[in-house]
């Protein structure tokens, strides 16, 4: 007799057995699933607050990926010998999990939802990041939360022209391709990767091959849901108020919204749109139908945003011009000024229309490389690209801190440049590039 209602699904996947288990641990979470491949084990949980927040204009989903040092028999670095703030790898993997699952929740879901993927065992061969995508999806599938369909994560490598699904760490060292993707039963839902000058048709073939190969992971989640899933909560998306939408469209036309959307400069257009919104709000307050309706008044911004999208789309289709007046083939004016900083090792100011980036390069010795703790041991980096997006670049006031988005965008640019940066004993240097966004439209 056991106190656990444990349900598992085990199947052969590539060169490994994969097991999905639920009902044994984290039973007070809304949903929990343990996924194991080799000796790498990931526990994913999802919890939704029972008190919903009304009136939010976004889905309050938080996704965190955590690597426990004990998973590889290691001590955390630092004085306190305890896991601290997320590493760059953990932050990037959190974003990797977030992207495929976020669109599968229904629009308008008001509950705060937290997905947590914890690496609790690592064999240092089978990568835990792609397992975490599958584990997170399975946890949500098992929970009462509405969720469109199961997705699974995978990595595609290529050695000697042959694709490999979920290659080991050793195999990845020889691969000229590193694609991380997520797929449902019938479509790709997320792709991220890097390669060493691989032709486009190879990438397309790899993705189609990977989508087919990963289906056992999707099917296993569906089966596990049938065996152990909780009853899904009832959720009816809030329907748009057709009468209010029509009234605001009428007011927007009279307030000059279309003319405001034709202002070519971003900040001037922003001011013009603000004036239009103020006119619409004042008109609604004077309207006997909506004057006392706080919900209607608070939804004006969202509805105007919806109307603006329609206006811009119609203009592109009917006139072939974009929001700033350009046609669909004209590139914004570009100006590049190299050597703009007198004491930096390398610098350039890149301006394209109302978007501007100051890029600065610093060259150091091998002692300047970045040393990082990881489950596979100490890792060093000799090339790094850091991306900063300060609030003044879009004319806003916000706290100054490094966001997940900045870390993600920096990693994306770093992947693009890494293949052309010299490495090895013939180049015993460390290179750091910083991209400072000074303007953005």
What are these regions (language model features)?
Residues 107-113, 148-150, 217-235, 267-268, ...:
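Flexible, glycine/charged-enriched surface loops at secondary-structure junctions
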Residues 4-8, 13-16, 30, 41, ...:
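Alpha/propeptide regions of enzymes that mature by internal proteolysis
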Residues 144-264:
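Mobile "lid/hinge" segments at catalytic clefts and subdomain interfaces of large enzymes
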Residues 29-113, 119-126, 185, 192, ...:
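Glycine-rich, flexible beta-strand/loop modules in the N-terminal catalytic cores of phosphate-handling
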Residues 2-49, 236-379:
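Extended amphipathic alpha-helical scaffolds
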Residues 76, 80-82, 92, 96, ...:
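Small-residue-enriched alpha-helical segments and adjacent helix-cap loops
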Residues 124-130, 240-246, 438-441:
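Short glycine/threonine-rich loop-to-helix capping motif typified by GTGT followed
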Residues 68, 102, 106, 141-145, ...:
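Generic secondary-structure signature for well-ordered alpha-helical cores
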């Amino acid at each position: 007799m056991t106190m656990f209602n444990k349900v598992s699904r085990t199947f052969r996947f590539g060169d490994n057995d994969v097991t999905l288990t639920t009902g044994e641990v984290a039973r007070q979470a809304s949903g929990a699933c343990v996924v194991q491949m080799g000796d790498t084990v990931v526990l994913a949980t999802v919890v939704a607050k029972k008190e919903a927040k009304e009136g939010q204009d976004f889905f309050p989903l938080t996704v965190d990926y955590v690597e426990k040092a004990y998973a590889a028999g290691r001590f955390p670095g630092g004085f306190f010998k305890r896991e601290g703030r997320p590493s760059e790898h953990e932050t990037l993997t959190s974003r990797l999990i977030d992207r495929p699952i976020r669109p599968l929740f229904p629009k308008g879901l008001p509950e705060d939802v937290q997905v947590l993927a914890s690496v609790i065992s690592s064999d240092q061969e089978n990568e835990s990041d792609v397992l975490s995508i599958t584990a997170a999806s399975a946890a949500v599938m098992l929970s009462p939360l509405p969720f469109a369909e199961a997705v699974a994560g995978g990595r595609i490598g290529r050695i000697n022209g042959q694709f490999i699904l979920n290659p080991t760490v050793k195999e990845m060292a020889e691969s000229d391709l590193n694609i991380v993707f997520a797929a449902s039963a019938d479509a790709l839902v997320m792709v991220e990767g890097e390669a060493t000058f691989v032709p486009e048709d190879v990438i397309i073939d790899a993705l189609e091959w990977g989508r087919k190969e990963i289906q056992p992971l999707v099917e296993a989640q569906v089966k596990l849901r049938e065996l152990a899933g909780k009853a899904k909560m009832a959720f009816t998306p809030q329907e748009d108020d057709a009468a209010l939408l029509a009234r605001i469209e009428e007011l927007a036309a009279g307030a000059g919204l279309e003319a405001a959307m034709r202002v070519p400069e971003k900040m001037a257009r922003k001011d013009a749109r603000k004036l239009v919104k103020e006119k619409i709000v004042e008109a609604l307050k004077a309207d006997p139908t909506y004057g006392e309706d706080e919900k209607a008044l608070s939804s004006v911004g969202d509805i105007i945003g919806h109307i603006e999208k329609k206006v811009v789309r119609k203009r592109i289709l009917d006139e072939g011009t974009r929001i700033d007046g350009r046609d669909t083939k004209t590139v914004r004016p570009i100006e590049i000024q190299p050597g703009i900083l007198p004491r930096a090792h390398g610098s350039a100011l890149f301006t394209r229309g109302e978007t501007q980036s100051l890029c600065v390069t610093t060259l150091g010795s091998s002692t300047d490389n970045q040393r990082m703790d990881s489950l596979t041991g100490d890792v060093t980096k000799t090339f790094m690209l850091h991306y900063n997006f300060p609030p003044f670049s879009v004319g806003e006031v916000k706290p100054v801190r490094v966001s997940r988005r900045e870390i993600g965008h920096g990693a994306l640019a770093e992947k693009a440049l890494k293949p052309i940066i010299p490495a090895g004993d013939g180049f015993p240097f460390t290179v750091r590039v910083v991209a400072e966004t000074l303007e953005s439209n």
